[in-house]
């Protein structure tokens, strides 16, 4: 059985789709998936054993010059790749009009998605041949697992979902795996940042733990922040610029992770690493970290500036034994 997945973005949403593939793989021996995903996240599906082909799409980039000759050529090549095979099922797990119209509509196969009442954008359901009612009041991972189960005709397991990508990195862990923590300090929204002085204070509080700390970054301003956080601490390393797979490899070898609400926090969860995520204004309820040893540290009054380094250090200590952290 061959299935096409349409789940293009964001990083967290793409990662939250992986447990559904594991369910399907266990329920339907020999099933294989092709996956349409935004080019920036194209490495992620390849980490799952059930994915045979990744079809990158670049809607975010294309829309800036939709009718230019180079973009038209890219769109033509994408359409040819998308339509190269006939699928037993096409599952649109994105639930948006944009992806339904530009991707799902063009694919060859019976198209499945959430119905008018439960799709993220109800109009997207008009592009599906089979519409499934998926209750909204459950975690995003569970919604996607249910969508796959109903689309492919098996019962959704009652056990916790398994991302099944950690093993991809087990044979290529960093040489110092288990000897360091990773601090994920970067996020896209200002109100989701934990103040730099709190990060530095936490780093100082861990001086006697014997653990080293690694700081990844993506954009230049994040690199500058990482350098400020590391200044004066010999046991803190600002990592070089890395691919997503490179960052994943570092996370896979971490003893534990402390993070803000960001896509890499979901990647940590997918890699089964102990992770403390500090939350301020965002609600982790239905979209927060899902998986083993994922811990939520809420800021007083939902204001991250009010969450002290001492409080996070205490949270780490209280959870250290059960999460095998320090």
UniProtKB/Swiss-Prot annotation:
Which species does this protein come from? Escherichia coli O18:K1:H7 (strain RS218 / NMEC)
Q: Can you quote the domain comment?
A: Composed of two domains connected by an extended peptide linker. Displays the classical GT-B fold. Does not undergo a domain rotation, characteristic of the GT-B family, upon substrate binding, but allows the substrate analog and the reaction product to adopt remarkably distinct conformations inside the active site.
What gene is this protein a product of?
A: waaC
EC number of this enzyme: 2.4.99.23
Q: List keywords of the entry alphabetically.
A: Cell inner membrane, Cell membrane, Glycosyltransferase, Lipopolysaccharide biosynthesis, Membrane, Transferase
Q: Which GO terms describe its biological process?
A: lipopolysaccharide core region biosynthetic process
How is this protein situated with respect to the membrane?
Peripheral membrane protein
Q: How is its activity regulated?
A: Inhibited by ADP-L-glycero-beta-D-gluco-2-deoxy-2-fluoro-heptose (ADP-2F-heptose), a non-cleavable analog of the substrate ADP-L-glycero-beta-D-manno-heptose.
Which EC class does it fall in?
A: transferase
Annotated positions binding ADP-L-glycero-beta-D-manno-heptose: 187-188, 192, 222, 242, 261-263, 266
Q: Which family does it belong to?
A: Belongs to the glycosyltransferase 9 family.
Q: What is this protein called?
A: Lipopolysaccharide heptosyltransferase 1
Location, primary (coarse class): membrane
Q: Which residues bind ADP?
A: 187-188, 192, 222, 242, 262-263
- Organism lineage string: Bacteria, Pseudomonadati, Pseudomonadota, Gammaproteobacteria, Enterobacterales
From the UniProt record, give the pathway where this protein acts.
Bacterial outer membrane biogenesis; LPS core biosynthesis
The question of whether Protein biosynthesis is a record keyword is answered with no
Q: What does this protein do?
A: Glycosyltransferase involved in the biosynthesis of the core oligosaccharide region of lipopolysaccharide (LPS). Catalyzes the addition of the first heptose unit to one 3-deoxy-D-manno-octulosonic acid (Kdo) residue of the Kdo2-lipid A module.
Cystine bridges: none
